[in-house]
Amino acid sequence: MGQALFLTVLLPVLFGVGPEAYGEASHSHSPASGRYIQQMLDQRCQEIAAELCQSGLRKMCVPSSRIVARNAVGITHQNTLQWRCFDTASLLESNQENNGVNCVDDCGHTIPCPGGVHRQNSNHATRHEILSKLVEEGVQRFCSPYQASANKYCNDKFPGTIARRSKGFGNNVEVAWRCYEKASLLYSVYAECASNCGTTWYCPGGRRGTSTELDKRHYTEEEGIRQAIGSVDSPCSEVEVCLPKDENPPLCLDESGQISRTGGGPPSQPPEMQQPADRSDERGGGKEQSPGGEAQPDHPTKGGNIDLPEKSTSPEKTPKTEIHGDSTKATLEEGQQLTLTFISTKLDVAVGSCHSLVANFLDGFLKFQTGSNSAFDVVEVEEPAGPAVLTIGLGHKGRLAVVLDYTRLNAALGSAAYVVEDSGCSSSEEVSFQGVGSGATLVVTTLGESPTAVSA
């Protein structure tokens, strides 16, 4: 049948670019996680715990997977927010009053994440200076200049807020660019941020669409944030296609889809937030002092709790269709790709009569079938939870490539992909989607554009 199965990413498949240009492809690596600084901190904390264990501190002799970095208070007398290495077994399942914990996004902003500190019986080591330095270094590597500009716009207008494209107050309010109070966001919920090409992709720090008092703490600034993003110079020339990367700078592709060069380095990052002072306490105890420059929860000025919707007059660079209902159709031409962003337990897709696939999140698999073949090939999908992004690309002579990026139960990102060399598909096929769920969006782009770029 000429089928070949690869775990890879879409652009190298269709353009023949080697994996070394994009990083090693695997289930554990997926673009735009927005969690790389947090992963750096977790890894450093695991090293610190191992060092403390070797030095004789037995309570830190625990499996490395239990050690994480969190910005939080400590035991009873440690009342300031500092970076600490926690044994997750000592954390509470939920926070109460002022014992919440925070994780960090790739622009250095702390956002509430699951868990709470047991003030009387916490097993942690405070390493504020070491971890704060890693945050500063990580911002230069991973913070998109476009997202930094959007954050600066929000912070200048409403001090203490950051930019996200997410939900507002209640589930019926449409997704839009807003300036959010950080304490009102959830690190475990994905929103959209600006990539280092100016397109949007997923990042931590979103809203569930609930109707609590915290859900009121934002300002809708669609036009202003879009203008802030648009004010950043493109890293690629007008004749090149910008390919976002997790780490700055992005890649620039020529008209044939080959890498022509690496995009220009990121501009100096705006002072989006005051970094916590580089201080740490002794692990054995002692009264913790509150550093003067330590970041505390910020609140919007002028009363907060105000939603000022504004309609954007700036056209989107990538046309996007918001789907109303549980199904939709689109035409896929040779040299194009369809990207569907959805939250659903099961998605059925038919590419004309030449190819079909099923993404089943309940049973954890992506299966596909080509032409008249009655048997399905299956690709494992590990612990899927959602949201998910499905990209289908049609190359030369019916070459079909499919990539499914999804959120896992542990809030990490997963990816599954396959390629059919000779699918039997023509140069133009109608693609139908069934079971897309509510709030799905569909975008048609040319090959070479970011698979997750669902809007400008």
UniProtKB/Swiss-Prot annotation:
Activity regulation statement: Sialyllactose inhibits binding to fetuin, a host glycoprotein. Lactose and D-galactose (beta-galactosides), but not glucose, mannose, fucose, melibiose or heparin, inhibit hemagglutination induced by MIC1.
Protein name as catalogued: Micronemal protein 1
Gene encoding the protein: MIC1
Statement: the UniProt record of this protein carries the keyword Signal: yes
Single GO term (MF): Toll-like receptor 4 binding
Pfam families: MAR_sialic_bdg, TgMIC1
Organism: Toxoplasma gondii
InterPro entries from the UniProt entry: MIC1_C_sf, MIC1_galectin-like_dom, Micronemal-adhesive-rpt_sia-bd, Microneme_MIC1
Spans annotated as Interaction with host sialylated oligosaccharide chains: 124-126, 216-220
Subunit structure: Monomer. May form homotrimers. Part of the MIC6-MIC1-MIC4 complex. Interacts (via the beta-finger region) directly with MIC4 (via the second apple domain). Interacts directly with MIC6. Interacts with murine TLR2; the interaction promotes activation of bone marrow-derived dendritic cells and macrophages in the host. Interacts with murine TLR4, the interaction promotes activation of bone marrow-derived dendritic cells and macrophages in the host.
Region annotated MAR domain, chain positions: 17-262
GO biological process, one term: effector-mediated suppression of host innate immune response
Compositional bias ranges of the Basic and acidic residues kind: 308-327
Domains (record comment): The galectin-like domain has been demonstrated not to bind lactose, glucose, maltose, mannose, heparin, fucose, L-arabinose, N-acetyl-D-galactosamine, or N-acetyl-D-glucosamine. It interacts directly with the second and the third EGF-like domain of MIC6, and with part of the acidic domain. The MAR (micronemal adhesive repeat) domain was at first proposed to be TSR1-like (thrombospondin type 1-like repeat) by PubMed:9027753, but PubMed:17491595 found that this domain represents a previously unknown protein fold. This domain is jointly responsible for interacting with MIC4 and for host-cell adhesion.
Record region (Disordered): 247-330
